[in-house]
UniProtKB/Swiss-Prot annotation:
Protein name as it appears in the record: Small ribosomal subunit protein uS3
Pfam families, per the entry: KH_2, Ribosomal_S3_C
Oligomer status and interactors: Part of the 30S ribosomal subunit. Forms a tight complex with proteins S10 and S14.
Coiled coil: none
The keyword Nuclease is assigned to this record: no
BP GO annotations: translation
Species per Swiss-Prot/TrEMBL record: Erythrobacter litoralis (strain HTCC2594)
Gene name tied to this protein: rpsC
Sequence similarity: Belongs to the universal ribosomal protein uS3 family.
KH type-2 domain: residues covered: 39-107
Length: 231
């Protein structure tokens, strides 16, 4: 089943946790869920150049705490913090509550699955050969500390008449091992020939012991230390 399941969903409460962390009763759940979707959509559209990997939303009491994981945090913050203040005010209006923003820098975007997938999609839109884009991404990931990476592209690759799927893998990607720290993401490239789908799996080592917050903790430690997270 490891081959067919979403690697993140399979590892929830083992070494991963949810990106939306709050509890709601009754009809409030649907309202807050729709609000989360709108918040993420607005942030990704507003700071499209910031290379955002994920947005974590927490709602303790009447507060909304939003953590944005980005490779280029300066794009979000802006000159003297002007842009981040505008963003905070807009999100506060959307949520009708006080908003606290936390920007987390991703020091190694080459081993972040979401940024790798989006980078390949951007290259395909610019008509870069799909094999070159995939192999370049794999080489960069392995060079910067990934223990394994798998990339799958599907669609009218290279403008072919018949759609097909091609995949490349380097190193180990143990999908059945639940303690494996596997980052997974999908992206779409809107090319002149149609949509090309990209899936990326990045294996970053094993996390021993039960720790649902391990993934976020390792990313925070990498930000403060500036070195590769310990396995």
């Amino acid at each position: 089943m490891g081959q067919k399941s979403n690697p993140i969903g399979l590892r929830l409460q083992i070494n991963r946790t949810w990106d939306s962390r709050w509890y709601a009763e009754g009809n409030a759940y649907a309202k807050l869920l729709a609000e989360d979707i709108e918040i993420r959509k607005y942030i990704l559209e507003t700071a499209a150049q910031a290379a955002i990997s994920k947005v974590v939303i927490e709602r303790p009491a009447k507060l909304c705490r939003i953590s944005i994981y980005a490779a280029r945090p300066g794009v979000i913050i802006g000159k003297k913090g002007a842009d981040i203040e505008k963003l905070r005010q807009k999100l506060s209006t959307m949520t009708e509550s006080e908003v606290k923003l936390n920007i987390v820098e991703i020091r190694k975007p080459e081993i972040d699955a979401k940024l790798v997938a989006q980078g390949i999609a951007d290259q395909l839109i610019r008509r870069v050969a799909f094999r070159r884009a995939m192999k370049r991404a794999m080489q960069s990931a392995m060079r910067l500390g990934a223990e394994g990476i798998k990339i799958v592209c599907g669609g009218r690759l290279g403008g072919a008449e018949i759609a097909r799927v091609e995949q490349y893998r380097e190193g180990r990607v143990p999908l059945h091992t639940l303690r494996a720290n596997i980052d997974y993401a999908e992206a779409e490239a809107l090319t002149a020939y149609g949509i090309i789908g990209i899936k990326v799996w990045v294996f970053k080592g094993e996390i021993l012991g039960h720790d649902p917050t391990a993934q976020d903790r390792l990313m925070m430690e990498a930000q403060t230390s500036g070195v590769r997270p310990a396995r």
